Design a protein with these regions (language model features):
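Active-site-proximal helices and loops of the catalytic beta/alpha 8
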Residues: 12-264
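Glycine-rich phosphate-binding "P-loop"
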Residues: 1-11, 16
Length: 264
């Protein structure tokens, strides 16, 4: 009962002990378990480097509301409010490029649409990361320890496609360790084999993000978002004259018409 002061003080004391041990940030599991105002109180008291909540919901507005709710704890700075895992972006990407390995009557439970139009939200990015003022609070991901066994799980060549998106776009991207290191992992009777992993592809994408300065505030101009093709230009910031990255995902061909000196 987080309305109980004894419980509140106990949580704050525990977080203080974790910081003393060297922990820098908090990941809140099952963030729907109690009101976000209490997360705000705990964050304000402990001042982590970063905080992210697992509010498992594919609706970007509901994720925004949860983040906003953490302000109600009396937090005065946006640097201390909690972020949230961007399940809205996760499910949007999954529906585009993932065909389920789970079937019912021989039919996959989810079929990839290969239509990227849902990544264009009236000219802006889709998902929580595309909401004005929330990109620095949107922790984008391709899979995690729960989703990797679900029907929406990314497998095979779909994995680098998804990272090509989140690692070149605004948000706070994170990498699922099995995708990076490879190997077999089992949960709930489901086993996924990631072979030798995708470290080479992921390292290249992380290097691009770092060297070009792409960040949560970077500017995205979507050139194409349609069946078979997603293409966008990324500027380090909206005030920059030229894009630093051109991204193309999907089977259809596309050539950048903006910028010069592109390296594939």
């Amino acid at each position: 009962d987080h309305t109980n002061l004894t419980v509140q003080n106990g949580v704050k004391d525990f977080l203080s002990r974790l910081k003393a041990l060297g922990f820098k940030g908090w990941r809140w599991d099952v963030a729907k378990g109690f009101a976000p105002v209490y997360f705000g109180n705990y964050i304000q008291a402990s001042q982590p480097y970063y905080s992210v909540g697992e509010n498992w919901d594919g609706n970007a507005t509901k994720l925004k509301n949860w983040i906003d709710g953490t302000y109600a704890g009396g937090i005065n700075s946006s640097t201390t409010v909690s972020g949230a895992f961007d399940f809205s972006t996760y499910y949007t990407l999954s529906k585009i490029i993932v065909t389920s390995t789970e079937t019912k009557d021989g039919i996959p439970l989810q079929m990839a649409t290969n239509n990227f139009s849902s990544l264009n939200n009236s000219g802006s990015m889709a998902g929580l990361a595309g909401q004005f003022g929330y990109a620095e609070k949107a922790v984008t991901f391709v899979d995690n320890h729960d989703t990797f066994v679900g029907k929406e799980a990314f497998l095979g060549n779909n994995i680098p496609k998804a990272y090509a998106y989140i690692l070149t776009h605004p948000g706070i991207p994170c990498v699922f360790a099995p995708h990076y290191y490879g190997g077999s992992y089992t949960k709930d009777g489901v086993t996924r084999n990631y072979g030798t992993g995708y470290a080479t592809d992921i390292n290249k994408l992380m290097a691009i993000r770092k060297t070009t300065g792409i960040n949560a505030y970077s500017n995205v101009t979507i050139d194409r978002a349609e069946a078979g093709l997603y293409a966008a230009y990324i500027k380090k910031s909206a005030s920059d004259a030229e894009p630093v990255v051109a991204v193309k995902i999907g089977p259809y061909s596309w050539t950048p018409s903006l910028g010069t000196g592109w390296i594939l």
